Curated annotation (Swiss-Prot):
Top-level class of the enzyme under EC nomenclature: transferase
EC number(s) recorded for this UniProt protein: 2.1.1.244
Record family assignment: Belongs to the methyltransferase superfamily. NTM1 family.
Classification via SUPFAM superfamilies: S-adenosyl-L-methionine-dependent methyltransferases (SSF53335)
Protein name: Alpha N-terminal protein methyltransferase 1
Superkingdom assignment: Eukaryota
Role description: Alpha-N-methyltransferase that methylates the N-terminus of target proteins containing the N-terminal motif [Ala/Pro/Ser]-Pro-Lys when the initiator Met is cleaved. Specifically catalyzes mono-, di- or tri-methylation of exposed alpha-amino group of Ala or Ser residue in the [Ala/Ser]-Pro-Lys motif and mono- or di-methylation of Pro in the Pro-Pro-Lys motif.
Organism: Schizosaccharomyces pombe (strain 972 / ATCC 24843)
Residue pairs linked by disulfide bridges in the UniProt entry: none
Gene: tae1
GO cellular component, one term: cytoplasm
Entry-linked Gene3D superfamilies: Vaccinia Virus protein VP39
Classification lineage: Eukaryota, Fungi, Dikarya, Ascomycota, Taphrinomycotina
């Protein structure tokens, strides 16, 4: 796989997607899926309150933030400030307009090129974006996240998971990884899984979606 083409093809694809909830969710944004997704994420974060609930003035990062759907409906419910990290200019511009009155900052960069500030975050949320990183860049990115979270901080991953083997999609230039691959990459980034769960309520024809809470091995 040519990394440069892998990344440029993904940006080309997303540049052609409308900056709407329906666009962010691949045409599934008008039914029950958006709310089901939000409820699942909030419920998962409630399980982590024993860690992140102890952090005053929690700052969160919404990685692969799109138009800010997760920031608005999930992260701002628990965070005093959210940094939205998103490589697609049209999406980040839309997010700025929709969240203009909210305590948010906007970072227009791909995760493979983002170096988060050390010890800034109580929560780094990654949803439907890590499939757009190569294995090497994913390990490096998660390693940087390790240094960016505070003592009680958590890195969360919410991604599609394939059943048997990693699956490349040439349409949006993404790799849906199997659980074994994901956990191997987490381990290589010196992260351990402290909580995980399956997202319920999504159509059976879609890939299963899993949530993982990760902390540095020494935590």
């Amino acid at each position: 796989m040519d990394p440069e083409k892998f990344y440029s093809d993904a940006i080309d694809y997303w540049n052609g997607v409308q900056p709407t909830v329906d666009g962010m969710l691949g045409g599934l944004g008008t039914g029950r899926i958006p709310q089901t997704d939000v409820v699942g994420s909030r419920t998962f974060l409630n399980r982590l309150n024993y860690r992140i609930g102890k952090i005053e003035n929690l700052v969160a990062a919404d990685c692969g933030a799109g138009i800010g759907r997760v920031t608005e409906n999930v992260l701002l419910k628990i965070a005093s400030h959210v940094d939205l990290v998103e490589p697609v200019e049209n999406f980040i511009s839309t997010a700025k307009k929709q969240l203009a009155t909210k305590p948010c900052s906007f970072i227009n960069v791909g995760l493979q090129n983002w170096t988060p500030e050390k010890n800034r975050y109580g929560l780094i949320w990654n949803q439907w974006c890590l499939s757009h990183l190569t294995d090497e860049d994913l390990i490096a990115y998660l390693s940087r996240c390790c240094e960016a979270i505070q003592e009680k901080g958590v890195i969360c991953v919410k991604e599609n998971v394939s059943s048997f083997e990693d699956t490349f999609d040439p349409i949006d230039s993404s790799v849906t990884r199997c659980e074994q691959s994901l956990k191997s990459l987490f381990k290589k980034a010196n992260l351990v899984v402290v909580a995980e769960t399956l997202q319920h309520g999504f159509p059976e024809e879609l890939f299963p979606v899993k949530m993982y809470a990760l902390v540095p091995h020494s935590s």
